[in-house]
Amino acid sequence: MAVQGQRFMTKTQHYRKVTKPLLERKRRARMNLYLDELKDLIVDTMDAQGEQVSKLEKADILELTVNYLKAQQQQRVANPQSPPPDQVNLDKFRAGYTQAAYEVSHIFSTVPGLDLKFGTHLMKQLGHQLKDMKQEEEIIDMAEEPVNLADQKRSKSPREEDIHHGEEVWRPW
């Protein structure tokens, strides 16, 4: 018999009552984990700049992070023409790759006794790789450009072309 004034809980209500504190603990643990990671990054950066950090509270960590992100955003607004870091890294890589290919070519042309056929093959391969890198970048650049559908002409659908030309479309079935 139930005690007067006491309600029975359904299984769902009991499940929620038990799991809510567990979920809250996990959420807090996750927040603290990322705050600790931010703290480590901030301390490393401040040590590299010669600043001594005695203690950082959670509010300090968040404040420094927000200030850093605002500074980065202002820097992007102030220099809109500066290439993104990925592009700078790609340009540096390409310049280093080209320099290395030049040095390989120089060695093959100046050191006697090296197989010229192998050297020619190697230089062709290096050239093909450099060309492929440039083509991949162009494809990525085209994919990132916004598409203006108003500027494009309407193309006929494949069915309209089939009707007008009488050609059959190959199908695997």
UniProtKB/Swiss-Prot annotation:
Q: Which segments constitute the Orange domain?
A: 93-126
| Gene Ontology biological process | negative regulation of transcription by RNA polymerase II; Notch signaling pathway; R1/R6 cell differentiation; R7 cell differentiation; regulation of neuroblast proliferation; regulation of neurogenesis; somatic muscle development
Task: Specify whether Transferase is a keyword of the entry.
Answer: no
Protein's recorded name: Enhancer of split mdelta protein
Partners and quaternary state? Transcription repression requires formation of a complex with a corepressor protein (Groucho).
Per the entry, what this protein does is: Transcriptional repressor of genes that require a bHLH protein for their transcription. May serve as a transcriptional regulator of the Achaete-scute complex (AS-C) genes. Contributes to the neural-epidermal lineage decision during early neurogenesis. As part of the Notch signaling pathway, required to maintain the self-renewal and identity of type II neuroblasts by regulating the expression of the transcriptional repressor erm.
Q: Phenotype of the disruptant?
A: RNAi-mediated knockdown of the protein in the type II neuroblasts lineage results in an increase in the number of type II neuroblasts. Simultaneous RNAi-mediated knockdown of the ETS protein pnt restores normal neuroblast numbers.
Cite a single Pfam family from the UniProt record.
HLH
**Which superkingdom, per the lineage?**
Eukaryota
Q: Where is the composition biased (Basic and acidic residues)?
A: 151-173
Report the locations given in the UniProt record.
Nucleus
Return the domain comment text from this UniProt entry. Answer: Has a particular type of basic domain (presence of a helix-interrupting proline) that binds to the N-box (CACNAG), rather than the canonical E-box (CANNTG).
Instruction: Please state every residue range assigned to the domain named bHLH.
Output: 15-72
Residue window of motif WRPW motif? 170-173
Query: What are the boundaries of the region Disordered?
Result: 147-173
The UniProt record lists the keyword Nucleotide-binding: no
Chief localisation class: nucleus
Q: What are the protein's GO molecular function terms?
A: protein dimerization activity; RNA polymerase II cis-regulatory region sequence-specific DNA binding; sequence-specific DNA binding; sequence-specific double-stranded DNA binding
The protein's UniProt keywords, in alphabetical order, are: Developmental protein, Differentiation, DNA-binding, Neurogenesis, Notch signaling pathway, Nucleus, Transcription, Transcription regulation
Outcome (variant: H121R):
In strain: NVIII-42 and NVIII-18
**A GO-annotated cellular component:** nucleus
Q: List the disulfide bonds.
A: none
